[in-house]
Amino acid sequence: MLLKKEPAYRKTEKEDFPLIREFIRRNYKDRWEFEEAHTEKRLTRLLFYTYMISRDKVTVATYRDQVVGVLITGKGSHGHFAPFFRLKKGYHFLRLKLTREGRKNLEHFNKLQDMKKQLTVSQENPAPGNILFLYVSKDYRRNGIGTGLLKQ
């Protein structure tokens, strides 16, 4: 879809969190298979809370008052003191541990976390910030929204 006007970029608000979780779900839906819907929901929330703990900045792109893209950046391995997000992450981690499918998907999640740690510890590429998550809705891709989010 060709946009008639430029999208607006702003900091995220609490009302945007359900839509950000939906973007995370859409991003990983094609990569992981779920037999049960609650496993997909819990893993999505676990990823969301992990991102929110280690976030530095969360920016959303809006077009016609609709959120069409999100960028979550973080600095290193030092997260925010976010007790709410940490408690929710622990809760969903435990709920996933209780099911066979959840344990299988947690293995993939742990591999992702290990790769992320290796990239942040690497001395060859010291970066001031990391992109934790970047997503633009499929209908709005190829319009420079991702580039605009990165420039913010």
Which residues does each PLM region occupy?
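Conserved acyl-donor/pantetheine-binding loop and adjacent beta-alpha core of acyl/acetyltransferases
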Residues: 77-128
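Helix-loop element at the rim of GNAT/NAT acetyltransferase active sites that forms part
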Residues: 22-38, 50, 75-78
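Conserved beta-strand in the GNAT
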Residues: 60, 66-75, 117, 130, ...
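Short coil/loop residues immediately preceding or within conserved phosphate-binding loops
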Residues: 56, 126, 131
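Terminal substrate-recognition subdomain of acyl/acetyltransferases
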Residues: 2-3, 133-138
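A short beta-loop-alpha structural element at the N-terminal edge
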Residues: 7-22, 33
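Conserved acetyl-CoA-binding loop-helix of GNAT-fold acetyltransferases
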Residues: 136, 142-152
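Active-site rim helix/loop that mediates acceptor-substrate recognition in acyltransferases
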Residues: 37-58, 63-64, 72, 120
